[in-house]
C-alpha cells in the first residue's frame, strides 16, 4: 500500500493470487462483532470502468508496464478484452463496503481477500484485486489505477489491469460517510457469468463481521446533556451518530454505524428508563450508552425534583377583600411550575367608642349606620 498525493490524499492497494488449485491455509477463527453500516452503491458508474480497462488492454501504446529495472518496458501484446462477470461484481460490491470499514486486502473479519470469492461461490484459477478510496468519479479512479507515471514498484494496479491470465472483471463502488470506495476484482474463470442484472444504485444497510480486537472507542450523541423532570413526569430521550473507532479505517476518525445502542440508567430509584425517562424520586443519576460491548464516555445527567421541596415564599396575586378570598401564588425554584393558595376574606371590624361590634352582612351594616345617623 502506498499513499498517492492529490487533493484527497487517496490510497491504492492491489493484490494478486495465482494458481489457486491449492486450498487456502485455514487460520484460527477470529472473534468478530457484527457491525451494520449504511452505504450508497454506485454500480452504474462502476461498470463504465470496464471499457476503460479494455481500451488500455487493446491499445498499441498504453498496454505496457515498467520492468523491475525501471528503464525498459514490457509491452503487453495481443491482450484480449475482459468480460464483465456479474458474480465477480457481487464480490466487488461486498469488498467495497468492507474497505469502507477497514481499508485493506485483509477483510474486516481478518480473513484473506479471496475468501470473499468463495463465500459468493465464485471459483477461479487466477484472481486479483485493486482497491481505492477517495476518488469521486470512475474516470479519476481509473486514471489513478493506471499509474502511468509510476515506476515498477508503483505499478501493481496497472499490472493487474494488463494481466494476460485474467479473462473477466467485476467492479464495486460504494459511497460512505463522505467518501467513495472502489474495488476491481479480476479472475480467470472457466465459466464467466455474463448474464446482465440491473445496476444497483440503492442505499443499503449491510452487516459486516469485524474483528472484535480492532474495535474501540464507542461514541454517541445524546439529544440533551441534561434531562430535568419532576417526580411522576416522563420525558423523551434520543441518541444519534453512534460511531466506533476501527483500526485500519480510512477517511474519517470514526466508523458511523446503524446499530442501536443500549441505554442504561445508573440509579433506578431516582428515575426509570423504558423508551422514555420517568422521574421516581428526588435525586440525580446518569444515563450511559453501550454497543458492541463498549461503553461510550459520553453520558447524560438526569435530575429529578419534587416541587413540594422547592416552592418559593410566594406572592399575593389577588388581595382578599372583606367579602372575597384572595390568591397567593408559589413558584418552584427548579422548574418554575406554579401553584396557588386561597387567602381567606378579611371580614368586617365594627368596634368603636360609640358602637357595639356586631358581625353582620354589608347590607345590615348600612341600615345600622343609617339609624345611628338618625339618632345623632
Protein language model regions, located:
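Bacterial N-terminal signal peptides that target proteins for export
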Residues: 2-12
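Sec-dependent signal peptide cleavage junction
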Residues: 20-31
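Short, well-ordered surface patches within globular domains
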Residues: 29-120, 158, 164-169
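A well-ordered secondary-structure block
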Residues: 94-98, 110-193
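Low-complexity, Gly/Ser/Thr/Pro-rich intrinsically disordered linker/tail segments
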Residues: 180-216
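Disulfide-bonded cysteine-rich modules in secreted/extracellular proteins
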Residues: 195-204, 215-220, 306-325, 346-358
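Extracytoplasmic soluble-region selector
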Residues: 212-309, 325-328, 333, 337-341, ...
Amino acid at each position: 500500500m502506498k499513499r498517492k498525493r492529490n487533493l484527497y490524499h487517496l490510497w491504492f492497494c492491489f493484490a494478486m493470487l495465482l494458481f489457486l488449485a491449492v486450498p487456502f491455509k485455514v487460520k484460527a477463527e477470529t472473534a468478530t462483532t457484527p457491525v451494520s453500516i449504511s452505504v450508497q452503491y454506485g454500480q452504474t458508474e462502476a461498470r463504465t470502468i470496464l471499457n476503460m480497462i479494455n481500451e488500455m488492454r487493446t491499445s498499441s501504446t498504453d498496454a505496457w508496464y515498467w520492468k523491475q529495472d525501471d528503464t525498459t518496458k514490457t509491452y503487453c501484446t495481443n491482450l484480449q478484452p475482459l468480460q464483465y462477470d456479474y458474480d465477480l461484481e457481487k464480490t466487488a460490491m461486498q469488498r467495497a463496503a468492507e474497505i469502507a470499514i477497514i481499508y485493506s486486502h485483509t477483510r474486516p473479519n481478518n480473513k484473506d481477500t479471496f475468501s470473499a470469492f468463495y463465500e459468493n461461490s465464485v471459483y477461479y484459477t487466477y484472481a486479483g484485486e485493486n482497491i481505492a478510496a477517495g476518488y469521486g468519479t470512475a474516470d479519476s479512479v481509473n486514471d489513478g489505477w493506471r499509474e502511468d507515471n509510476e515506476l515498477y514498484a508503483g505499478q501493481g494496479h496497472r499490472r493487474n489491469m494488463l494481466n494476460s491470465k485474467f479473462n473477466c472483471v467485476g467492479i464495486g463502488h460504494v459511497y460512505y460517510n463522505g467518501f467513495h470506495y472502489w474495488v476491481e476484482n479480476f479472475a480467470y474463470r472457466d465459466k464467466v457469468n455474463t448474464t446482465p442484472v440491473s445496476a444497483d444504485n440503492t442505499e443499503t444497510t449491510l452487516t459486516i463481521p469485524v474483528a472484535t480486537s480492532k474495535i474501540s472507542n464507542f461514541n454517541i450523541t445524546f439529544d440533551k446533556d441534561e434531562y430535568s423532570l419532576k417526580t411522576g413526569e416522563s420525558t423523551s430521550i434520543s441518541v444519534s451518530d453512534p460511531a466506533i473507532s476501527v483500526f485500519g479505517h480510512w477517511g474519517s476518525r470514526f466508523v458511523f454505524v446503524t446499530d442501536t445502542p443500549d441505554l442504561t440508567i445508573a440509579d433506578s430509584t431516582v428515575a426509570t428508563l423504558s423508551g422514555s425517562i420517568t422521574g421516581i424520586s428526588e435525586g440525580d443519576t446518569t444515563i450511559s450508552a453501550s454497543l458492541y460491548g463498549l461503553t461510550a464516555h459520553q453520558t447524560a445527567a438526569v435530575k429529578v425534583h419534587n416541587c413540594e421541596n422547592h416552592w418559593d415564599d410566594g406572592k399575593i396575586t389577588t388581595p382578599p377583600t372583606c367579602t372575597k378570598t384572595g390568591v397567593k401564588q408559589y413558584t418552584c425554584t427548579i422548574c418554575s411550575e406554579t401553584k396557588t393558595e386561597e387567602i381567606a376574606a378579611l371580614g368586617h371590624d365594627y368596634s368603636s367608642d360609640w358602637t357595639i361590634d356586631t358581625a353582620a352582612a354589608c347590607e345590615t351594616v348600612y341600615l345600622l349606620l343609617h339609624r345611628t345617623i338618625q339618632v345623632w
